[in-house]
Design a protein with these regions (language model features):
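Helical element adjacent to the flavin cofactor pocket in flavoenzyme catalytic cores
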Residues: 127-165, 170-183, 335-343
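C-terminal catalytic lobe of FAD-dependent flavoproteins
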Residues: 276-350
Length: 350
C-alpha cells in the first residue's frame, strides 16, 4: 500500500520506518528538516515516569516504552549525567513521603542524597534517579539514517493538503499542534486541546551544575538539563515557559510569535521571560543568578485540556475512518509503542 505520514517529528518518523518494511511510505514535513518543532524545544529527557506522580497512567505508559527507546537510539544517549528529582518544601502537589511511595509502587529506582547546588531550605527531599537524556542532534542524525535505510520518501518544506486523501491508501496524521488541521472534513473527530506558546531558555551555568539534570517537583517549578555536547543547559519552568494558551480545535498565535516558532535557538529574541526564569530558579539554586543567557527557543506545545490536576501526558493513537489514523504524541519515549499501534491498526484493515 501507499501510505502518507504527515509530520516529521519523532512519532511520524518512527511510524514511517516501521511501516516501510511492508509498504511504500511518504513522509511530509512542513519545515526544512525533521525534528524541528516541539521535538526540538525539548528537555531531551527519556521519561521513565518519575515526572508524573499524579498520573499513574502516564507513568505506566512511559515506563513500559522506556527500554525500547533506549535500545533503538542507544547512540544518542548522553553518558555521565546524574539525574535528580527534588520535592519542593513549599507548594508541591505531592509531598515527599507520597513521592517515595509513588516511586516504590512503580519500581522506579532512587537514592536519597544531598545536592550541594540546591538551597537546602527550599526542598524537602532530593532523590538521585535512574533516568537518561538524549542528544537531539545525534537523534536527528540517527533518524535520517533509519529513514534512508528503510526507503521512506521524505518531502521537506511541504504542507500536506486534502489531496493526500485521494492519492494514498492510508494517511497517518502526526502533526502534534496541528493534528486537527487535516480533519476539517471530520468535525466530529476533532478534539479540543490546550495549546501553549512556550519558550525554553538556554543558560551557561556555574561549574557546580556540570553533568547534572535537576527537576524540582511537583508543581509550578522548573527543571535544568544539559544540552548534548554543549556547555549550556536548557531550562523549563512550568509557569514562565508559557507566554499564552488557549483551549480549542486550533492554536491562537499572536503575530509577534510567528517569526520565532520552530526556529531553534534564537540569540537575543525580541522578547523573553528570562528574568522570570532567573527569579524562579534562584529560589532553589543560589548561584542561578550567575548564569549567562545564551538564547531561547519557541514552539507550540499541545496537551489534553483539563489535565492540570494530574499533569497527564498520554500518547493517543486513534482510527478516524477506514484510511485515516491520528497520533497525538505524549512523551518521546512512547514513539515506538505508538508506531506499533499504528501498524496493528493498518494490519487489521487489510
Amino acid at each position: 500500500m501507499k501510505i502518507a505520514i504527515v509530520g516529521g517529528g519523532i512519532f511520524g518518523i518512527m511510524s514511517a520506518i516501521k511501516l516501510a518494511k511492508e509498504h511504500d511510505v511518504f513522509l511530509f514535513e512542513k519545515n526544512d528538516d525533521i525534528l524541528k518543532a516541539a521535538s526540538n524545544v525539548n528537555q531531551c529527557r527519556i521519561h521513565r515516569g518519575y515526572h508524573y506522580p499524579r498520573s499513574d497512567e502516564t507513568t505506566i505508559q512511559t515506563s513500559k516504552s522506556h527500554d525500547s527507546f533506549l535500545e533503538e537510539f542507544s547512540e544518542s544517549i548522553i553518558s555521565g549525567i546524574d539525574n535528580y528529582y527534588c520535592i519542593s518544601k513549599f507548594d508541591s502537589y505531592t509531598k515527599s513521603k507520597e513521592y517515595v511511595k509513588f516511586c516504590k509502587r512503580h519500581n522506579l529506582e532512587f537514592t536519597k542524597v544531598n545536592l550541594d547546588l540546591i538551597d537546602k531550605n527550599s526542598i524537602d527531599i532530593c532523590l538521585k534517579v535512574k533516568e537518561y537524556l538524549f542528544d537531539h542532534e545525534i537523534l536527528k542524525k540517527k533518524c535520517w539514517e533509519k529513514l534512508d535505510k528503510s526507503g521512506v520518501t521524505v518531502y521537506l518544506n511541504t504542507i500536506a493538503d486534502y489531496e493526500i486523501y485521494e492519492k494514498y491508501d492510508f494517511i497517518i496524521i502526526s502533526t502534534y499542534a496541528n493534528v486537527n488541521s487535516l480533519l476539517k472534513k471530520y468535525p466530529e473527530k476533532q478534539r479540543d486541546y490546550q495549546f501553549e506558546i512556550v519558550e525554553k531558555i538556554f543558560l551557561e551555568l556555574p561549574l557546580e551544575f556540570k553533568n547534572k539534570s535537576v527537576v524540582i517537583m511537583d508543581g509550578h517549578f522548573l527543571s535544568i538539563d544539559p544540552v548534548g555536547a554543549k556547555n549550556y543547559f536548557i531550562i523549563g519552568d512550568v509557569v514562565n515557559t508559557v507566554h499564552s494558551r488557549n483551549i480549542g480545535k486550533f492554536p491562537k498565535i499572536d503575530a509577534k510569535f510567528i517569526p520565532l516558532l520552530d526556529k531553534g535557538l534564537i540569540k537575543n529574541p525580541p522578547f523573553t521571560n528570562l528574568n522570570l526564569f532567573l527569579k524562579s530558579g534562584s529560589r532553589f539554586f543560589p548561584k542561578f543568578n550567575e548564569a549567562k543567557y545564551i538564547g531561547s527557543s519557541f514552539c507550540v506545545k499541545t496537551v489534553l485540556p483539563e489535565v492540570d490536576s494530574t499533569d497527564a501526558r498520554l500518547t493517543l493513537v486513534e482510527m478516524i475512518d477506514k484510511k485515516i489514523i491520528t497520533i497525538f504524541s505524549g512523551k518521546i519515549s512512547t514513539c515506538i509503542d505508538a508506531a506499533n499501534q499504528v501498524e496493528k491498526l493498518i494490519k487489521a484493515r487489510k
